[in-house]
From Swiss-Prot:
Positions bearing Phosphothreonine: T196
Stated name of the protein: Chaperone protein DnaK
Induction (free text): By stress conditions e.g. heat shock.
Protein purpose: Acts as a chaperone.
């Protein structure tokens, strides 16, 4: 059995880690970075780019570059009006579900997330040198059932068996507390990422990680701070030039990148200059954007966002039934916690300096890897007790939501309650499953509906319908309804209407595999072309250096093979390039044999110039190693 990797599938960046013995290791991607931008793009030629490659071309290809897809996971189209405004790409309504359009093809958010997960999977496989099929994936603690299901589906499409969905603050607490098993402390994990905000209160001790309460806002994160800067820059430029840059997709993408950079700079400086030359043009000529932004101004225009951060904190502390002074540490997680004002708010609210001992960008992936180690049996003496973030219940008479499972109930859990009919001779009931904290059913999130029929006719209130709610370790819900008189039972695993069915997932998995094969083929072609380029360079260098030492009868054939390789490199396929390389190496091998028979000739290596770099020179010794000797030419007259 292979390793279970831990993946932090973030709004802005993603990260992958794995247990190496007893220690978690964050894995660098192919670009040498420990985090990967959560971005996907399709170029005009149809090439699919993920991560840094997608980010690099975002300015010139904004309509076909998708970012912050996590904010659309498991959501209806009418639930994401604000997120839609932040997107440079097209977000469309398909049967009430939010979908994205890339290069005229429609993708579900799960498919796009699967592309990012595939990149993380490949990163882990390259590092481990083996296939990876199992993963623990993190989600915001305040993700609802539909969003958790969507994340699990994305994992399946990417070819991963998702062993556990784990809440991000809980994962961070695991990473923070792994080496503190013997101590007992109460910890608040404050997680402000690119698209979501979570606050969880946990009790750590003797290897037990118990979540006391959790709260948050899945519409609040770094993207929203960026948007405040974007709007400010666009408004200022409109005042100066009379042009709204938000109507120009390329200019808007430049504003987005500049806003993100300015936000980062304001974490270490009190002001920054945003300078975007040639941002647009009119008949009068090119226009440039040069605006100075101070930290004070940034904090003032984001005041409403800072206020929103405090509300979930109040609720989380209240629901934990702990006094503020009982909380020992406040651990900061997520890139947006680097904003000085956020750190000040945390300090003022909790009355203590926040703990900055963990890397906010990597700690969640590390925690996921630890959970993978727990499931695998590599990490022992660790027990994780998480909670359901939102209340769960059904709609009852009068459109009221009757709760069966309260928010912050430890999971896994199972609750039963008996209900009855609302009318005489009623022979069927509809079970309307809800998630949320509002008293009226219509104000909460519908998770699903199902019917229980063939109830024997009886006066109102007589039939006994037993409803059971069952939440598994992933926080995913199953519901059953049973007529106690007949024993007839109806059970469903809650699937939001937007959830992908098995056939759709299998099709998407196949598409993902095909793209993975295409990506591998493309990489192999690039490797061949790089080798050919190196061989051409080495051959030309040796031709110059060896000159007349190359036998006259062999030189034309060598030069002919070189020209053939150049032509194949310029216009040919990978197969034709490889064939031309083989021919050229064969010619070099033949020439090398001749040169070795000439004592004073510096021959190329027996198989020709190295395709990976400089040609080898020198004489081979008896042990097969190249021997380089220093020698001196002595004139006979000096003897």
């Amino acid at each position: 059995m292979g390793k279970i990797i831990g993946i932090d599938l973030g709004t802005t960046n993603s990260c992958v880690a794995v247990m190496q013995g007893t220690q978690p290791t964050v894995i660098e991607n192919s670009e040498g970075n420990r985090t990967t931008p959560s971005m996907v793009a399709v170029t005009k030629t149809g090439d699919r780019l993920v991560g840094q490659a997608a980010k690099r071309q975002a300015i010139t290809n904004p309509k076909n570059t998708v970012f912050s897809i996590k904010r659309f996971m498991g959501r209806k189209y009418d639930e994401v009006p604000n997120e839609k405004k932040l997107a440079s790409y097209d977000v469309i309504n398909e049967g009430g579900e939010a979908r994205v359009k890339i290069n005229d093809k429609i993708y579900s958010p799960q498919e796009v997330s699967a592309m990012i997960l595939q990149k993380m999977k490949q990163t882990a496989e390259d590092f481990l040198g083996e296939k990876v099929t199992e993963a623990v994936i993190t989600v915001p603690a305040y993700f609802n059932d539909a969003q958790r299901q969507a994340t699990k589906d994305a994992g399946r499409i990417a070819g991963l068996d998702v062993k556990r969905i784990i809440n991000e603050p809980t994962a961070a607490a695991l990473a923070y507390g792994l080496d503190k098993k013997m101590s007992s402390e109460k910890v608040a994990v404050f997680d402000l990422g690119g698209g979501t905000f979570d606050i969880s209160i946990l009790e750590l001790g003797d290897g037990v990680f118990e979540v006391k309460s959790t709260d948050g806002d899945t519409h609040l994160g770094g993207d929203d701070f960026d948007q405040k800067i974007i709007d400010y820059l666009a408004d200022e430029f409109k005042k100066q030039e009379g042009i709204d840059l938000r109507n120009d997709a390329i200019a808007l993408q430049r504003l987005k990148e500049a806003a993100e950079k300015a936000k980062v700079e304001l974490s270490s400086r009190t002001d920054t200059e945003i300078n975007l030359p040639f941002i647009t043009a009119t008949q009068e000529g090119p226009k440039h954007l040069v605006i100075n932004l101070t930290r004070a101004k940034f904090e003032a225009m984001c005041a409403d966002l800072f206020e929103k951060i405090l509300e979930p904190c109040h609720r989380a502390v209240k629901n934990s039934k702990l006094d503020m002074k009982e909380i020992d540490e406040v651990v900061l997680v997520g890139g947006s916690t680097r904003i000085p004002k956020v750190q000040t708010l945390v300090k003022e609210f909790f009355g203590k300096e926040p703990n900055r001992s963990v890397n906010p960008d990597e700690v969640v992936a590390i925690g996921a890897a630890i959970q993978g180690g727990v499931l695998k049996g590599d990490v022992t003496d660790v027990l994780l007790l998480d909670v359901s973030p939102l209340s769960l219940g059904i709609e009852t008479l009068g459109g009221v939501m009757t709760r069966l499972i309260e928010a912050n109930t430890t999971i896994p859990t199972r609750k039963q309650e008996v209900f009855s009919t609302a009318a005489d001779s009623q022979t069927s009931v509809e079970v309307h499953v809800l998630q949320g904290e509002r008293p009226m059913a219509s104000d909460n999130k519908t998770l699903g509906r199902f019917h229980l029929g063939d109830i024997p006719p009886a006066p109102r209130g007589v039939p006994q319908i037993e409803v059971t709610f069952d939440i598994d370790s992933n926080g995913i819900l199953s519901v059953s309804a049973k007529d106690k008189a007949t024993g007839k039972e109806q059970t469903i695993r809650i699937e939001a209407s937007g959830k992908l069915n098995d056939a759709e997932i299998e099709k998407m998995k196949q598409d993902a595999k095909e793209h993975a094969a295409e990506d591998q083929k493309k990489k192999e072609e690039i490797d061949i072309r790089n080798s050919a380029d190196s061989l051409i360079f080495s051959t030309e260098k040796q031709l110059t250096e060896l000159g007349d030492k190359i036998p006259a009868d062999k030189k034309p054939r060598l030069e002919g093979s070189l020209e053939k390789l150049k032509e194949a490199y310029k216009n040919g396929t990978a197969e034709s390039i490889k064939s031309a390389m083989d021919d050229l190496n064969k010619e070099w091998s033949d020439i090398a044999s001749s040169l070795y028979q000439t004592p004073d000739a510096g021959a190329p290596g027996a198989s020709g110039p190295s395709a990976g770099g400089e040609p080898e020179t020198g004489k081979k010794g008896g042990d097969g190693e190249v021997q380089n000797a220093e020698y001196e030419v002595i004139d006979g007259n000096d003897k």
